[in-house]
Amino acid sequence: DQIVAIGFEDKSDFDYCDATFYLKIANPGSIDTETPELPSVDPPSTVNNTTTGILAFEDLWPSRGDYDMNDVMLEYKSTLYQNALTGKAYRIVDEFTPLHNGGSLTSGFGYQLYKLGQDGVRSIQVDGPAGWKIEADQSSPTIILFDNVRSVIGQKYTVTIELNDVDPKLVASPYNPFIFVGNRDKEVHMVNYPPTAKADKELFNTHDDVSNVSAGIYYISRYKGEVELMPFGMNLPIIDSKLLADGEGVKIYETFPNFIGWVQSGGTKNKDWYKKK
């Protein structure tokens, strides 16, 4: 007898075992065992755009703590594939490499395509160290790469996401990256990027956090009670990460004097503050 197993996926964790059954074939050879040639999933014409950068986070939020902003640092490279005829995005390939862990706390990392619904994704594949997961119970695609940055320093993750031909503006990198510290519900995001559904919202406006949740302003603090929008997470160009990592335990605006001017201007001035003039 021949046995043919069939599995179905009912949501978005892509394990294809939500409903399974098998066929028992009484007449061997009645089913063609040759795999048919699959058509290409790529559109006839493709353009792609690659962005790179470094993500840096302070793990003591909602307190500023030492505010050295180097507790979790990752380098990323994201490539967006678009149909040249329609302009729609059909695939993104993200590479993340943890560079540095300057904190004493246990921090994990994930990211969310927060402008996109689950129906905008056809599949997600992650290649890298074990322990990654896809949070299928979120309203937007959310990928957790690791729970403890210390164990994966220098190891690369490659995430390939096949999309259902979506507006590229909905999947602009670096999306909504975040760390979570100690527990999954203590998330730290970049300025004005929203928490996921798993975050503990009661932490806002405690200690040094001055978020205005009703206005959609998240994860900020103040400098001397005056300069607002002091971040707990940053997206930087590719720089010598050693400059930031070496400032362990020292406030970032003491290591980089032009940092405050950059924050105060809303990012329009002192754009090269990280060059430490």
Question: What is the predicted role of each segment?
Answer:
Residues 1-277:
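Extracellular distal adhesion/interaction modules in secreted or cell-surface proteins
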